[in-house]
A protein has these predicted regions:
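Short beta-strands and strand-loop turn motifs
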Residues: 102-105, 130-137, 165, 183-186
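Conserved phosphate-binding/catalytic region of the ribokinase-like
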Residues: 172, 200-310
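Conserved phosphate/ATP/ADP-binding segment of small-molecule kinases
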Residues: 146-234
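Conserved N-terminal subdomain of the carbohydrate kinase-like
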Residues: 24, 48-130, 300-310
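Short beta-strand scaffold segments in enzyme catalytic cores
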Residues: 44, 91-93, 227-231
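Hydrophobic alpha-helical segments and helix pairs
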Residues: 112-150, 155
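Glycine-rich phosphate/adenosyl-contacting loop at the front of the ribokinase-like
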Residues: 1-56, 64-66
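Gly/Ala-rich phosphate-binding loop of Rossmann-like dinucleotide-binding domains
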Residues: 47, 156, 265
Length: 310
């Protein structure tokens, strides 16, 4: 079974606009709300793809009913520590004409230290039942910045593989505990590891150096419309998605993580891990709002994903 951790869950409000004008009038074509947060997105995708998943994080008392209803509607098993406050709401303005998304995200309610420690204890109580755990996304105020390092250490003690999808100090501190795989996007990777430039060759070279340093076993970097790469320091693969109509970009990176997790659960090799990830992301790009890929789309797209060795 795969587990996910979402310490800063939210409601995503996705507004579709045809031609965004800064400082001008913008009319919304479509508007939807989804329970979200990076780990929850991974869970939703895994659930749709047929992989058993255990979701965990904080439960904000002021938004308890709407959040639990969203989890129930999506058949997610959620282990949580309840805290005061309300779910943050993130506004995603997607311009379908330019295919550019502008995000306006709230920070999330403050979480006191005793609740953080309570979650670490909760996590330690169930992580040993998992094969893989995904740690992803931002953290709210009050949560220690080395939280992912602490959780990865607890998972490593139980022999559980960790996938880390964070940015900045959350990513770098998490690396100190040697997760199995990290999955930054292009911007996060360049910001944290400073390759010479943003070319595929330089990103792949820097990713291999990170693995060879012993910080992690694998590195995957998502590169937007270009696709994604995966390396174990020896072999490196690049996968490009098929042509398709993009309806929204939210959750695509989380779907890559879900696809990789599914391939790991099925015992697949690196090329298929990447193929699964890009196929899942492609399926999500076809959905509106923060809606994850459908299994039928994933299965149809899977043989269309081109994977090559670099």
């Amino acid at each position: 079974m795969t587990g996910t951790v979402t310490l800063n869950p939210c409601i995503d409000r996705t507004c579709c606009i045809d031609g965004f004008t800064v400082g001008g009038m913008n009319r919304i074509i479509s508007d939807r709300r989804d329970i979200s947060g990076k780990g929850i997105n991974v869970s939703l995708a895994l659930k749709e793809l047929g992989e058993p998943v255990l979701t965990s994080g904080f439960l904000y008392s002021g938004s308890r009913s709407v959040f639990l209803e969203g989890l129930k509607n999506n058949f997610l098993d959620y282990r949580a520590v309840e805290v005061d406050g309300y779910l943050r709401e993130n506004i995603k303005l997607w311009d379908k004409r330019s295919d550019i998304t502008t995000e306006v995200n709230q920070k999330g309610a403050f979480v006191p230290e005793d609740k953080v420690e309570a979650f670490i204890s909760l996590f330690s109580s169930f992580v040993g039942t998992l094969d893989t755990v995904v740690l992803s996304g931002s953290v709210p105020e009050g949560v220690r910045r080395d939280i992912y390092r602490v959780l990865i250490e607890r998972a490593n003690e139980k022999g559980v593989k960790c996938i880390l999808d964070g940015e900045g100090d959350l990513l770098l501190s998490g690396l100190e505990a040697r997760p199995f795989l990290i999955k930054p996007n292009e911007y996060e990777f360049i910001s944290a590891f400073a390759p010479k430039d943003g070319s595929l060759e330089e990103i792949a070279k820097r990713a291999k150096e990170i693995v060879r340093s012993g910080m992690t076993t694998m590195v995957s970097v998502t590169l937007g419309r270009r696709g994604a790469l995966l390396t174990d320091g020896k072999d490196t693969y690049f996968a490009s998605p098929p042509e398709m109509e993009v309806k929204c970009t939210q959750g695509a990176g989380d779907s890559v993580v879900a696809g990789i997790s599914l391939a790991m659960a099925e015992g697949k090799g690196m090329a298929d891990m990447l193929r699964y990830g890009v196929a899942a992301a492609s399926g999500t790009l076809m959905r509106e709002g923060t809606e994850m890929c459908r299994k039928e789309d994933f299965m149809r797209i899977l043989p269309q994903v081109k994977v090559k060795s670099l």
